[in-house]
Amino acid sequence: MAANSEGIVFHFLGTGGAQQVPAFGCECEICQQAQRDEKKRRRACCAAITTQDRIILIDAGLPELAPYLLPYPIRHILLTHYHMDHVQGLFPLRWGYGDPIPVFGPPDEAGCDDLFKHPGILHFQPPLTPFQPFELDGISITSVPLIHSKLTYGYLIQTPTHTLAYLTDTIGLPPETVQFLSAHTLDYAIVDCSHPPQTTPPRNHNDVTRALEIFTQLNPKQLYLTHIGHELDRWLQTQTLLPENVHAAYDGLVLGL
């Protein structure tokens, strides 16, 4: 999808979980396909918003970020949480050159490894307060609490023409987050969905059943699944049960904002 008149685009840089696709040592059909065809691979969950000649990075799951982001400079970074598969790209990035890069995210005294102690060009900002909007490059950003094993935020992202909710990693949504997001007309909801339907609720990440519950709760115009594992990919190849406006995102997909 092309950018809108404001030149704002949302990029899925990675749509996999920490395991990624292909999973190490796995010989299932999905992982074999991904080994042969780069288009079927899923790198660690990561996204970016490009605004003309600059980037707002959402998480840093890719160990080597530069090839995916050139030639645009990273102006800001939003972190959902400090699990390694969402921040590993910051470790080489911090020793780069150029202006300091403001980094926003939830409160977490431990952070990840020594990022806080040795931030390099990363400029970690005071922790965000849920439901308090702020602005980056003319885009309104509001953090919302999620449900995960580590304190995690999703983000409501509002441009002059579109509204998007980015909601990973999570298992369901807290009632206050549902109430807040339901008050907005969402063009897009990007929702964690790591597993095919489960008989009992999974831990930390949605399955298809819980992701579709979020679809019903928030009623977005379009919902995109992300943080997808190889088992869900296998299920998606054999099922046609997703509602018309629910899609599995893939690495490289872009949405106009």
Identify the role of each PLM range.
Residues 1-176, 188, 237-257:
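Binuclear metal-dependent hydrolase catalytic cores
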Residues 172-256:
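Cap/insert and terminal regions of metallo-dependent hydrolase folds
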